[in-house]
Curated annotation (Swiss-Prot):
Membership in a protein family: Belongs to the NRAMP (TC 2.A.55) family.
Protein name per its UniProtKB record: Metal transporter Nramp1
Pfam families, sorted: Nramp (PF01566)
Entry GO CC: plasma membrane
Taxonomic path: Eukaryota, Viridiplantae, Streptophyta, Embryophyta, Tracheophyta
PANTHER family reported for this sequence: METAL TRANSPORTER NRAMP1, SOLUTE CARRIER PROTEIN FAMILY 11 MEMBER
Organism: Arabidopsis thaliana (Mouse-ear cress)
Amino acid sequence: MAATGSGRSQFISSSGGNRSFSNSPLIENSDSNQIIVSEKKSWKNFFAYLGPGFLVSIAYIDPGNFETDLQAGAHYKYELLWIILVASCAALVIQSLAANLGVVTGKHLAEQCRAEYSKVPNFMLWVVAEIAVVACDIPEVIGTAFALNMLFSIPVWIGVLLTGLSTLILLALQKYGVRKLEFLIAFLVFTIAICFFVELHYSKPDPGEVLHGLFVPQLKGNGATGLAISLLGAMVMPHNLFLHSALVLSRKIPRSASGIKEACRFYLIESGLALMVAFLINVSVISVSGAVCNAPNLSPEDRANCEDLDLNKASFLLRNVVGKWSSKLFAIALLASGQSSTITGTYAGQYVMQGFLDLRLEPWLRNLLTRCLAIIPSLIVALIGGSAGAGKLIIIASMILSFELPFALVPLLKFTSCKTKMGSHVNPMAITALTWVIGGLIMGINIYYLVSSFIKLLIHSHMKLILVVFCGILGFAGIALYLAAIAYLVFRKNRVATSLLISRDSQNVETLPRQDIVNMQLPCRVSTSDVD
């Protein structure tokens, strides 16, 4: 048991466990930038919780989402809108669980994984999480390269190389206030959202068809399932679960049972508002693309653009709103989207590395490593396949994220449904059942598509029989390993109880926010013995 400097709050563990969390100080001296939640019960407290949900929602309107939305509308009109609705609802439930985990336990998801799993599973989960961060960064790289191409006519492959420099410059500007920087970027992103809302008025999509697409599930035509999975992967991202569970630790909240419950409730409302905005943006992008590309009076040039629509060609969709400036405005918003998503991705990567390995890097170095890994495949594809190939790589990256989601989602569901970790704030049975149904559907769709696509690939391949058999053995062995890894996470019992920060002597005791989360730099944290 270790006490803070004031002696008011204590870490109480119901079970020792064979692994411990890295120690995190409770800061006694708050600075002027801290967000402090009042002890008094009031709806005004909600404003103190605004922030994490909107930062997380940036990932829902990143270049990867724009790319998949544009292709979904161009190829299937409004038929895949229901995927956006389902994914947004699922994202709200899942993101709220991530926030609850951080609020209740004081530790984010990656730290919980390190405490719960042994070295080998923990290392593998870290590898998968890092791959997810890199896969998430690929659309940002390509989206930024497309934006530079539209703004300055820079070849896409050169733009790919320049993306590392542009993001490092933005990260260097953090010393002037990261909040101001992120709000500026978010403003630019929502500028393009307003344009799509206005374009929605000009394109006049049929309301009945839009509602039918939103509420009637259908997957017709070749490639619809793959695009649906990429839409799902672009909406519910594994790195967001790590990010959200960490960002909520930046608030100073009352540690009473009622204070924690209020924090969870307000974070749910905040996440709902943020994801509602992201949902409307994604629906408008699909609807505009569907209405414009399926119009009967489409010009031959626009029809050609729609047949192979990607971020580099999408500016013509805004022509009715801003005319000849459509390309420049879309490029600026695309650049803002890519850079803002990269910054939040950098934070997520920091928390992943710190949580799983207890290893911390400077933000610029962390971003450089991630960006280099994302640039390599992007550069190769841009050189070989041009902008069309780069656009297809965004879809592939989104599909990779969808396949990797179970390795972040299952631990989250297990932890938040565990009484020894969440105490009285454990998920109700109804929420537990709902979240497992959501997780099961996501995993089921992924597995079905993976197996069916692999079989189709083998059947239609022109390889010799011996090579088909060899590839089949390797492929199905990989699928079996994938299923076994998910099964291990699902059926393994939680063995480590969380150390909860609680109060023995007061219902109004507060804990100041985690210092490493507040300043977003992940400095070396002093042990609790140093705080005494």
